Amino acid sequence: SLFPNPTSYISYSTPFSPLLNNKILFATKVGYNCPERVVTLQGDKPEEVIVNLNEEQLKSIELPEHEPFEFTGGYGDQVYGWIIKPINFDEKEKYPVALLIHGGPESSWTSGWSYSWNPQIWAQQGYVVVLINPHGSTGVNSAFLNAVRNDWGGVPYEDIITGINYVASNYAYVNKNKMCALGGSYGGYMVNWI
């Protein structure tokens, strides 16, 4: 695995070539609480933000908290996911759950901003959003990724059900009686299995 914990990183994309004798790299950086911005990366130095077009707009918007979680899924493997909490979250309250299932299946939820399947939108409406990266997701290792081959509804389904049960059992603020599952493409396929 490139990262020891697939929920601990921010997403970078590097559509640009390195500059100045291969010592500076331009990249776009995204996270759950920030849309894309252009940064430079230079060795051990802190990144420098070059372009942040959304900075002013985001100052007036409260964005939900997010946290990673992990559980033991199919084949005894660790499976990773995210919980996005509603605005004005109160741990003493019970919240409905929106389980978002990513497409692909060879894709993954990362700490990234999305303009189409943005979990922040559901959290803004009062849902606890659960994002699980079942077998077949990218970012862990090739065996984890390839486990979905010829078995789209097998171990990934097991991971999703085990994961949502884990969340329901370990997070007191989750309303077990008010849950829905959503997804597009492969995510829609998995919703039909559920």
Predicted region positions:
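A short beta-strand motif characteristic of beta-propeller blades
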Residues: 2-5
